Amino acid sequence: KVVGTLIQQLGEKVEYQNISAEDQWGALRKGLVHLQVEVWQASMSKDFNKMLKYNYIEEIGTHSAIGREDWWYPDYVEQSCNGLPNWQAINTCSHLFSEDSINGKGVYYTGLWDFGDADIIRALNLQFTITRLSDDKSIWDILKTAVREKRPIMLLNWTPNWTDVRIKGKFVDFPTYTSECESDPSWGINKDLVKDCGNPKNGWIKKTVWTGLKDQWPCVYQLMKNIDFSNEMIAEASALVIADGHSEDKAAEIWMNKYHKNISSWRNSSCSP
């Protein structure tokens, strides 16, 4: 909403497309969608790099924010599970995260995005099963309920995100990611399988646009190049809606008032309203 508002202030019309992460690439290539403000390394880099290779989209910069997407738990879980955040501890304590007293395997909640979690579970022999939820709102609803009940929960989370500033928690400390972990089975502790590591701990968050944006809307293109989000900015934007319950319009208003100095620096004098 913030970026949309800034574009509207340039005198342009804005339409918000509710589109899946998978479908966004074809839409960007065809010009059905014109910009994506946040491309996250762990969940989107494969498709993103493939699209760049064939010049189907244009990359126009990297945010200052450092991203991470991985297994996460609220801090209070450590009271019941010694050894956290070390990944080996979650096997010892897998029963704490179980919904089935028979097999005792823990449940890992995630969305429809492909992080290779099934591969990680196999490669590290984790005593967990995966429950996929339809969207991030469903993940946060389950998290909020667990926190209210102080119940152990393991789920996909990312930073920057609303939990950074509203709920204390930690990422599981898996073996450190390298590119070899995804391609060379001999790398790492499991010599037979790839993905015996976590996701990148210091991932990039990039901006990408339709290749025709610069020619058709040069001022929007320049604005997109100038926009630079910090971790705090992204976390606060998310928290205003998810944790504080503001509408997206009200959250955008509060956010823009808080970061008005940054916004001023993003505007191009020749394009300013």
Language-model features: locations:
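Solvent-exposed loop/turn segments at secondary-structure junctions
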Residues: 21-23, 41-45, 76-79, 112-116, ...
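C-terminal functional modules
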Residues: 200, 213, 221-273
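Pocket-flanking alpha-helical
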Residues: 19-55, 142, 162-167
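Ligand-binding pocket segment of bilobal, Venus flytrap-like solute-binding proteins
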Residues: 33-37, 106-183
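A conserved helix-loop-strand patch within extracytoplasmic ligand-binding domains
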Residues: 56-109
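C-terminal lobe and pocket-closing loops
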Residues: 163-223, 227-228
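A bilobed periplasmic-binding-protein/Venus flytrap-type ligand-binding module shared by bacterial periplasmic
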Residues: 68-80, 202-216, 239-240
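Short, polar/charged alpha-helical segment
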Residues: 1-11, 121
